[in-house]
């Protein structure tokens, strides 16, 4: 047990005491990082199921010395390297932005207050914490009073009061008040060390695209080994092919089943979006939050700092009793704000207006709470002064307050009571007397109206959730061009059941407690919405944590920045549309080009099934060997799955995201995959009956496979633009340039289309083009 420090002699540790503790390892070095480590990045890009299966296939090809067919593995290595480089670049940018945003802990050492990083704290350090700060280590209160939000640790939204000698847990946040505290545990000894890691880092986000691809990979991963064995035995034993040919043909089928291209492109696109947003001063703390943004159809806004500038100013002070004129009111407010530890924007505005000589010494105080909507202070020679929302402190409505609210102002009442201040059970006294009204203005953010209109035009639903009076919020919303400004509710007057019932239809929620903010988000999510929440205060933390995606302003409380998915470093609400649409660009473009990649997965699976089935028929001449070799697939991929889709992912595409990504992509790819299967069966049967050589059959199939792939690229390039046409020309010319080059033909085991195969190619492609147009039109109608 640490000996409790004498609070009357708070000098902090000396430098020699600090060094002693550092030598003993009593340092708070257990820190959660919002950034992935370099090793995690390497591991994520190298040690994957895709790479493991590809590596196994490469080993088999190397064993039979099929060196030319190992080109695919060079592409796999390059893809892994590219993924590592891109992630490292994104990590560097995130780390750099996080460094600029890093919060310091005010620490007392040798009687001087200094700012330290959380990991520099040692056991017994004395730290100063204020509202909005996250507690970096378990600490005992030496001086002061605070209300602590322990929701990150316990899941309970109720605030916990902390007084002298109380223990505060790391990972929790100060919702109100200010304290001096002594570090009680450091590093891994902290009670909440693991929970702190979870609270400080961003909540994991499920990527629907990656989840779909994982399902596909899981399926192929289960069948690839038995399929591989069956195909190898078929070629080697039943067909009597040499070991090398058997391994090469079997490997091609297995490689084709792996949807590695689309997985790589998804990660690359998301990381590119992280970098692009970083250049726009938007800190993305979780890569997959970009995808979640794309699916957002309900954006919940905290009024202060988003629609408004968050720059409060006291407009008027209106005395409500003849016993206290403006001068008397000013003395009370000056004393109140001089003693108050409240640092929210409203308190700062009042403090700026009423600064001067203190007339009343403080006996005790109760910080402002976003749950109560008021704070209080017992002043010597005066009584207990209350400052907060009129409807929370007064029984009767004040007409002047209503008028100010309708002007869009924030209204506070200054009230007085002769009852003692009760910290343990804060409640409104029975003898409370209203002294004055304070009208506080918060200017509307420039461009907010255009931003709201634009979001609405893009099918993004909007809700305003605020702790302010709903009449004030409605008035501000009207000035900001919010269409549903008349749809509002006072949440202080309804219970949870009523709030749940109104959450979907109501547009503006006023006098919302932190618990109610969270409940609104939960209700919207249960209704099927993908939610995003913007905020900047400690009272927003529960809702931000609950939302599918959280967006906060850099000027907001440190606590919100630490748990947010995205941080607007410019603190500009007008950046929100661009962030949403960057996510849409990535997801829509991936969904748009996914069929190009899935064609190979489908036809490889179908052909493998047909090959295995043909072996069961019992006649050697009917046995079908997988018709392609890895080098052929790799070469076609460079011009079909490689450059064109990569370029297309950068195009702007802000339409709402479609659901059922994998199902729709598979259906769009199916006609082309069936064309490939038909081509193989027809050319094998017809070519054999015509006495074609294996090279002629292989050449025709190579051109048909590439051409069917190019049709999908053409569909992805519709409607045509100059840039897209040039992209198509480059791909086709590149393909022909390699296919007609003699040395490459030798590697590919093909030749040139002959007088026999060229007419068949032309006729089949004519039929395929007609079928492709018809199926594409049918899919568009659906």
Which residue ranges define each predicted feature?
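Transmembrane helix-loop-helix hairpins at the membrane interface
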Residues: 27-104, 350
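Actuator/coupling domain of P-type ATPases
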Residues: 7-12, 16, 21-33, 78-81, ...
């Amino acid at each position: 047990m640490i000996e409790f420090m004498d609070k009357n002699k708070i000098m902090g540790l000396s430098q020699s005491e600090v060094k002693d503790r550092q030598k003993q390892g009593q340092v708070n070095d257990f820190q959660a990082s919002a950034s992935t480590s370099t090793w995690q990045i390497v591991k994520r890009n190298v040690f994957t199921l895709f790479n493991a299966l590809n590596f196994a296939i490469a080993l088999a090809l190397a064993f039979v010395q099929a060196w030319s067919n190992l080109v695919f593995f060079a592409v796999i290595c390059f893809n892994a390297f590219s993924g590592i480089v891109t992630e490292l670049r994104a990590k560097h940018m995130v780390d750099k932005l996080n460094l600029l945003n890093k919060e310091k802990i005010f620490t007392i050492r040798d009687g001087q207050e200094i700012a330290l990083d959380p990991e520099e704290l040692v056991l017994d350090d004395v730290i100063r914490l204020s509202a909005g700060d996250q507690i970096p280590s378990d600490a005992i209160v030496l001086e002061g009073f605070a209300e602590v939000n322990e929701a990150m640790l316990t899941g309970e939204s109720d605030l916990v009061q902390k007084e002298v000698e109380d223990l505060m847990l790391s990972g929790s946040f100060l919702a109100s008040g200010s304290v001096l505290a002594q570090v009680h545990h450091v590093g891994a000894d902290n009670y909440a060390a693991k929970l702190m890691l979870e609270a400080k880092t961003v909540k994991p986000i499920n990527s629907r695209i990656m989840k779909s691809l994982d399902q596909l990979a899981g399926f192929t991963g289960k069948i690839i080994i038995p399929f591989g064995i069956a195909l190898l035995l078929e070629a080697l034993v039943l067909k009597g092919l040499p070991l090398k040919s058997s391994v090469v043909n079997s490997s091609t089928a297995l490689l084709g089943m792996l949807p590695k291209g689309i997985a790589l492109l998804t990660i690359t696109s998301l990381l590119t979006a992280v970098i692009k947003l970083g250049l726009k001063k938007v800190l993305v703390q979780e890569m997959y939050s970009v995808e979640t943004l794309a699916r957002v159809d309900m954006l919940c806004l905290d009024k202060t700092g988003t629609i408004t500038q968050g720059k409060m100013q006291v407009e008027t002070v209106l005395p409500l009793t003849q016993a206290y004129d403006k001068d008397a009111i000013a003395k009370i407010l000056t004393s109140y704000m001089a003693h108050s530890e409240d640092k929210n924007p409203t308190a700062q505005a009042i403090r700026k207006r009423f600064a001067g000589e203190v007339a009343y010494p403080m006996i005790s105080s109760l910080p402002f709470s976003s749950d109560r909507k008021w704070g209080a202070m017992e002043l010597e020679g005066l009584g207990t002064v209350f400052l907060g929302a009129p409807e929370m402190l007064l029984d009767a409505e004040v007409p002047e307050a209503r008028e100010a609210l309708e002007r869009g102002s924030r209204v506070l009442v200054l009230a007085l009571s002769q009852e003692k201040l009760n910290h343990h059970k804060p409640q409104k006294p029975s003898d409370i007397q209203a002294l004055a009204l304070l009208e506080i203005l918060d200017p509307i953010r420039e461009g907010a109206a255009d931003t709201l209109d634009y979001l609405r035009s893009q099918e993004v639903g909007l809700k305003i959730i605020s702790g302010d009076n709903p009449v004030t919020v409605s008035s501000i919303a009207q000035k900001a061009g919010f269409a549903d400004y008349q749809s509002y509710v006072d949440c202080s007057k309804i219970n949870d059941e009523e709030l749940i019932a109104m959450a979907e239809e109501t547009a503006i929620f006023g006098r919302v407690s932190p618990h109610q903010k969270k409940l609104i988000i939960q209700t919207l999510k249960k209704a099927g919405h993908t939610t995003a929440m913007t905020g900047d205060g400690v009272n927003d933390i529960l809702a931000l944590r609950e939302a599918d995606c959280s967006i906060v302003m850099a000027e907001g409380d440190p606590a919100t920045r630490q748990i947010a998915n995205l941080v607007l470093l410019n603190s500009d609400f007008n950046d929100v549309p661009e962030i949403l649409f960057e996510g849409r660009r990535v997801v829509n473009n991936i969904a748009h080009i996914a069929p190009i990649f899935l064609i190979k997965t489908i036809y490889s699976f179908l052909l493998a099934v047909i090959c295995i089935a043909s072996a069961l028929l019992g006649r050697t001449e009917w046995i079908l060997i997988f018709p392609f070799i890895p080098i052929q697939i790799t070469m076609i991929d460079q011009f079909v799955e490689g450059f064109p889709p990569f370029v297309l992912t950068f195009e702007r595409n802000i339409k709402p995201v479609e659901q059922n990504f994998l199902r729709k992509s598979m259906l769009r790819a199916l006609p082309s995959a069936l064309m490939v299967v038909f081509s193989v069966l027809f050319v094998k049967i017809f070519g054999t009956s015509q006495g074609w050589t294996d090279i002629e059959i292989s050449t025709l199939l190579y051109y048909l496979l590439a051409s069917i792939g190019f049709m999908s690229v053409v569909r992805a390039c519709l409607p045509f633009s100059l840039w897209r046409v040039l992209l198509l020309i480059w791909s086709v010319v590149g393909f022909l340039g390699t296919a007609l080059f003699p040395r490459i033909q030798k590697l590919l085991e093909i030749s040139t289309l002959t007088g026999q195969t060229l007419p068949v190619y032309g006729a089949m492609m004519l039929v395929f083009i007609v079928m492709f147009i018809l199926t594409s039109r049918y899919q568009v109608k659906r």
